[in-house]
Design a protein with these regions (language model features):
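Short flanking/linker segments adjacent to small metal-binding domains or redox-active Cys/His motifs
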Residues: 80-117
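Short, charged surface segments at domain edges that flank catalytic/cofactor-binding sites
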Residues: 1-10, 89-93
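Short Cys/His-centered divalent metal-binding micro-motifs
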Residues: 16-19, 47-75
Length: 117
């Protein structure tokens, strides 16, 4: 969903255009706070944005550049809220299925809107 949501935006880190034409896609859903160090933020949309693979994987996430891009996109207050969020979240299997279904629904809607443009 995040990759589709941000498809028309530049990379959150470097500002270069995203290119979906490459095999396997040329961009990922990158997380500002990694899912390894902050698994509780995995499904928080402010924490996830389209990011070129070069920035996400081989640039070690480019945290400083990501933060600067994030401030431009969502504002300093929301970035600081992400940075301060230490609230653990434990999802049940049913909650995870509901999240999956919600994101599938939203992705279908995005694709339909893009097809109608």
């Amino acid at each position: 969903f995040i990759r589709a949501r941000d498809a028309d935006k530049p990379c959150i880190c470097c500002g270069l255009p995203l290119s979906a034409g490459d095999v396997g896609g040329a961009y990922d859903c990158g997380h500002y706070r990694s899912t390894g160090s902050a698994p509780h933020l995995r499904f928080v949309e402010d924490n996830a944005h389209a990011q070129r693979k070069q920035c996400n994987r081989w640039g070690a996430g480019r945290a400083v550049d990501y933060r600067l891009g994030l401030i431009q996109r969502i504002g300093l207050e929301r970035v600081e809220a992400l940075e301060a969020d230490q609230e653990p979240r434990k999802y049940t299997a049913d909650e995870l299925k509901a999240l999956r279904d919600e994101y599938r629904r939203r992705l279908r809607k995005l694709r339909q809107e893009a097809a109608n443009v």
